């Protein structure tokens, strides 16, 4: 499959390429390919990366407050990238990138219900809760309602401050098609072999579900 890759806030596509190096190396052996998109909004670097990596750094939409119209702008920016660089079979996002992917999938299903989803599968790593297209409210899980209907791999870290949001993102996904893996660490993509192999296993199972339909 060909994956669109969406980085977290205050980073960029090149940093996300490094963060996902371990899992990509194994996934590429199965023929999967990855394309990285930068967010649209210039941003300050994530605090833990300051002085370690070079910029520029980006957000997909405004962070730290209700993002308002910048959510729709992020949708447009992403769809334009898909039109120019796609098509993509799947999406993989980290933190804000995961939230953007989820929000875009939900928005697209609401506004274009008769069209197929933008992606056949999604991988959410340390995901934040997605925002409504208005950028005024986050999309909270509702009983027996699953707006993300494609196969998903939901990868979280128990020691991550965003762990509760990652669980809520998982609860937005169709349960029969949603895999859940806790790597047990902080807000990161672990590099150790055990977690790398388990994350790849979960992603490959998600891809297989998408292929089976």
Residue ranges and their predicted role:
Residues 1-87:
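Serine-hydrolase catalytic machinery in alpha/beta-hydrolase-like enzymes
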Residues 14-15, 161-167:
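Conserved alpha/beta-hydrolase "acid-adjacent" motif
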Residues 92-101:
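Gly/Ala-rich beta-loop-alpha elbow adjacent to hydrolase catalytic centers
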Residues 113-128:
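A conserved short beta-strand
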Residues 130-131, 156-164, 186-188:
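Acidic catalytic loop of the alpha/beta-hydrolase fold
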Residues 147-148, 153-156:
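Short beta-strand/loop motif that positions the catalytic acidic residue
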Residues 173-190:
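Catalytic histidine neighborhood in serine/cysteine hydrolases
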Residues 191-205:
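Post-His helix in hydrolase/transferase enzymes
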């Amino acid at each position: 499959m060909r994956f669109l890759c969406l980085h977290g806030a205050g980073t960029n596509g090149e940093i996300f390429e490094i963060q996902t190096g371990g899992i990509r190396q194994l996934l590429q052996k199965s023929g999967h390919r990855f394309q990285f998109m930068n967010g649209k909004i210039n941003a300050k670097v994530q605090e833990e990366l300051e002085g370690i990596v070079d910029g520029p750094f980006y957000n997909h939409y405004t962070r730290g407050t209700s993002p308002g119209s910048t959510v729709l702008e992020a949708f447009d920016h992403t769809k334009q990238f898909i039109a120019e660089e796609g098509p993509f079979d799947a999406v993989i996002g980290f933190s804000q990138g995961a939230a953007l992917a989820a929000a875009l999938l939900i928005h697209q299903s609401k506004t274009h219900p008769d069209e197929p989803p933008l992606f056949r599968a999604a991988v959410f790593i340390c995901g934040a809760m997605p925002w409504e297209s208005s950028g005024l409210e986050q999309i909270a899980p509702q009983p027996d309602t699953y707006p993300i209907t494609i196969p998903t791999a939901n990868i979280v870290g128990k020691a991550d401050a965003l762990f509760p949001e990652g669980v809520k993102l998982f609860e937005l996904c169709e349960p029969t098609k949603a895999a859940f893996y806790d790597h047990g660490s902080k807000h990161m993509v672990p590099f150790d072999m055990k977690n790398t192999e388990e994350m790849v296993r979960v992603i490959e199972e998600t891809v297989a579900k998408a292929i089976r339909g």
